[in-house]
Swiss-Prot record:
InterPro entries: Pept_tRNA_hydro, Pept_tRNA_hydro_CS, Pept_tRNA_hydro_sf
Function: Hydrolyzes ribosome-free peptidyl-tRNAs (with 1 or more amino acids incorporated), which drop off the ribosome during protein synthesis, or as a result of ribosome stalling. Catalyzes the release of premature peptidyl moieties from peptidyl-tRNA molecules trapped in stalled 50S ribosomal subunits, and thus maintains levels of free tRNAs and 50S ribosomes.
Residues bound to tRNA: 14, 64, 66, 112
Residues at the active site: 19 (proton acceptor)
Protein name (Swiss-Prot/TrEMBL): Peptidyl-tRNA hydrolase
Pfam family, one: Pept_tRNA_hydro
Amino acid sequence: MKMIVGLGNIEKKYEGTRHNVGFMVVERFVEEHGGNFNKEKFDSLISELFINGEKIIVIKPTTYMNESGRAVRPLMDYFNLTTEDIIICHDDMDLEIGHLRLRQKGSAGGHNGIKSIISHVGTEKFKRVRVGIDHPQKMSVVDWVLSRFTKEQEAKLDDGLTRAVAALDDWIENDDFMNTMNRFN
């Protein structure tokens, strides 16, 4: 069993914002696998999928971004998962829009959702799919991550979301994250 977590803010006003890229990844992943987020447990919307005979739990925390760990830890405990079994999809300002960077571990890098997960699971050693949202040019970081993409940026983002879903599929199919990293980084 594996768990895929998409980070974002659940309120309608945040849909389509840069900070919700993690939600966009898991929403597309679930849609492409014919599922939906039809369960709610431990401050999360949940989709349970079976891919190649393996149960895949996909979650969107309903906490605010900065409290994501409060949703992730109880679900890990409930499903008896370790950090080896989970992957977190989130936005990254240090990458150009739509670019991917897969990592096996690392610091929060200023991302408060990741910081919360590290705090609640007690380690930095969990997989991540980081999707670029670019750096703010002339606005504050808060205003930037809560802003929406331009039409031109949406096309680049769409390519990134497609590649992120392909990376998740690769990880599930081959169960070898190092090879997935080599293919998608």
